[in-house]
């Protein structure tokens, strides 16, 4: 057995597998990542790393593989000098990937949506003048696009680019609504535009769109747009009457902040459950009226959050009041926030609603271990991985999952640091290769055992051991030396 600080002699056939594992090792230092950038392996995982050093990014940006450069372009943490290089890339796919600034998912919180920061102004200017319409269209989707550049793109000679630039303005200026509607002429584009308006839709603009819909040969295609008009327009008596007589629009108009109090009070007793739910979710509604309204919610649905509650500045008494609300939608939305007091988390942890308890496990840094264990035992979705990584997840519950007959249970538990050594060893000999690989990443493996795994005959185990965050940096460099990097 090799000494703890001595790298084993790596079999040549395992060298590429080792390098792939190192590329995903969260503890790999910047200098190791720079060396890996020149490796003859699939480096897409390396290109996606948020901690990719600038020097490594420069190397990857000059690579001949367009798919690799495209993955690099999607990395939200690139230095400006690399962004400029990619904005001038010969491949339109690479430039478009850089331009879109698409959302990505992270396990900080729980696979919560994150959006990259803005690109440099020079990059935006360059991409806005790109000769390929598909690149400019991708840029028009970018939520960080400066307003002056977006305004210029409203006059793009490519009609589709101009329409996207209008519909994706976030927040869209109500003062320019006529101009924006003249560009976003499709029903779906207009629906998106109204969703992003920075204020209520002027009644005159609403009437203009309604006239277009009424004269359309396919009014059914505008059902979503109609609901958005009803929810955002400045309501007068005529508009209110029209919307309230159309049953599919009653819930939308019930959510409209300009609806007069008399109609709000009447709709609170509407026979339609969706209409009452829309009334209940109104911002500024009298708490007594809200709590008097009966609404049924789909307990297995993660949708229907109360958006304003997510951003509301709340005191602890406010938190506790919503945590005890009769309405599941408020308790569920509250559970999505990460600034809750221990008392509020305690109340929500014992909630009768599965959806509320699930969000406690997914979003709360102080979620109780007993609840994490209970939910993870039966919850098979992606967020279970985050629950097992939660600092409060009990070791005995992880061990029970690791000994399950289901490999999907075993793999999710295989990297838990609280597993007994004999359980980890059993997982390393598991019948399923992805379980064995995951077990090799367990941070509780002793250094000498980890070193022997680097010499294993099986690529899955070798790759997992190389990705283990406790692997010594000196060993990483010794592997890179053997690869002549």
Regions found by a protein language model. Name each.
Residues 1-485:
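Alpha-helical scaffold segments
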């Amino acid at each position: 057995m090799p000494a703890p600080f001595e790298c084993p002699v790596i079999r040549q056939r395992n060298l590429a597998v080792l390098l792939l594992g190192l590329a995903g090792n969260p503890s790999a230092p910047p200098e190791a990542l720079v060396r890996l950038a020149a490796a003859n392996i699939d480096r897409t995982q390396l290109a996606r790393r948020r901690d990719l050093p600038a020097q490594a990014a420069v190397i990857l940006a000059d690579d001949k593989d367009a798919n690799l450069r495209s993955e690099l372009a999607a990395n939200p943490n690139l230095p400006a000098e690399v962004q400029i290089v990619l904005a001038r890339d010969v491949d339109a796919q690479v430039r478009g990937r850089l331009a879109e600034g698409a959302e990505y998912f992270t396990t900080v919180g729980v696979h919560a949506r994150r959006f990259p920061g803005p690109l440099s102004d020079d990059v935006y200017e360059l991409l806005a003048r790109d000769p390929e319409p598909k690149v400019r269209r991708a840029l028009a989707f970018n939520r960080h696009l400066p307003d002056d550049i977006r305004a210029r793109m409203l006059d793009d000679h490519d009609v589709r680019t101009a329409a996207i630039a209008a519909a994706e303005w976030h927040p869209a200026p109500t003062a320019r609504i006529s101009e924006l509607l003249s560009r976003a002429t499709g029903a779906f584009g207009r629906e998106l535009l109204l969703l992003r308006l920075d204020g209520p839709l002027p009644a005159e603009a609403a009437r203009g769109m309604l006239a277009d819909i009424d004269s359309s040969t396919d009014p059914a295609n505008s059902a979503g747009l109609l609901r958005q008009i009803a929810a955002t327009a400045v309501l007068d008596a005529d508009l209110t009457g029209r919307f309230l007589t159309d049953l599919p629009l009653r819930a939308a108009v019930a959510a409209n902040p300009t609806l007069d109090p008399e109609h709000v009070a009447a709709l609170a007793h509407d026979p339609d459950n969706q209409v009452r739910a829309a009334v209940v979710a109104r911002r500024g509604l009298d708490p007594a009226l809200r709590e008097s309204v009966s609404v049924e919610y789909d307990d297995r649905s993660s949708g229907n959050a109360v958006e304003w509650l997510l951003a509301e500045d709340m005191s602890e008494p406010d938190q506790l009041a919503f945590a005890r609300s009769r309405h599941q939608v408020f308790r569920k939305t509250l559970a999505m926030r990460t600034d809750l007091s221990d008392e509020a988390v305690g109340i929500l942890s014992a909630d009768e609603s599965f959806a509320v308890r699930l969000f406690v496990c997914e979003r709360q840094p102080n979620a109780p271990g007993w609840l994490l264990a209970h939910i993870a035992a039966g919850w098979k979705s992606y967020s279970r991985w985050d629950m097992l990584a939660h600092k409060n997840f009990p070791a005995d519950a992880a061990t029970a999952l690791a000994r399950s007959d289901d490999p999907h249970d075993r793999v999710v538990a295989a990297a838990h640091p609280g597993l007994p050594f004999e359980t980890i060893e059993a997982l390393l000999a598991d019948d399923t290769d992805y379980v064995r690989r995951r077990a090799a990443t367990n941070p509780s493996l002793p250094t000498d055992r980890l070193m022997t795994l680097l010499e294993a005959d099986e690529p899955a185990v070798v790759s997992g051991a190389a990705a283990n965050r406790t692997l010594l940096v000196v060993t990483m460099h010794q592997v890179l030396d053997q690869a002549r990097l």
